[in-house]
């Protein structure tokens, strides 16, 4: 007797502790409630496996399937789902309090591109030397970034001072 399956639905003799099953044949037709061993014999007659589809229902629902092909298709679906899943990255844009107009526009285009790709953006404003005394200029700059991106992004972390840097994190809507 083979060891019970660790993953996926139970099949054939791995289905234990069941007297009757709700049977669905290979064409998808409901055969009603059938004794388990009769269902197993019918599956062997047609050369397919008896696979437990809904183990929690009473009686459990079983279907005639080619178990190898069924597991292959399930694995394929999981791999496709994994491929489609995108990990959210945090991209960083570094600004200075005295940034020029054109430089600011270039940085904002980059921010917009990051949001289109679905990434979060960490806006870092770095103060050098005596610039730290003029934090209000930095705060106004970050507020301007927030205003210009409010259509496409939401603020995940409000502007806050960490050492000589002011940081704000934005996430796409």
From Swiss-Prot:
Claim: Protein biosynthesis is one of the keywords in the record: yes
Entry-linked InterPro entries: T_IF-3_C_sf (IPR036788), T_IF-3_N_sf (IPR036787), Translation_initiation_fac_3 (IPR001288), Translation_initiation_fac_3_C (IPR019815), Translation_initiation_fac_3_N (IPR019814)
Record keywords: Cytoplasm, Initiation factor, Protein biosynthesis
GO cellular component assignments: cytosol; membrane
Location within or outside the cell: Cytoplasm
GO biological process entries: ribosome disassembly
Pfam families xref list: IF3_C, IF3_N
GO MF: ribosome binding; translation initiation factor activity
Major location category of this protein: cytoplasm
Domain of life: Bacteria
Family to which the UniProt record says this protein belongs: Belongs to the IF-3 family.
Subunit architecture: Monomer.
Function: IF-3 binds to the 30S ribosomal subunit and shifts the equilibrium between 70S ribosomes and their 50S and 30S subunits in favor of the free subunits, thus enhancing the availability of 30S subunits on which protein synthesis initiation begins.
Descriptive protein name: Translation initiation factor IF-3
Name of the encoding gene: infC
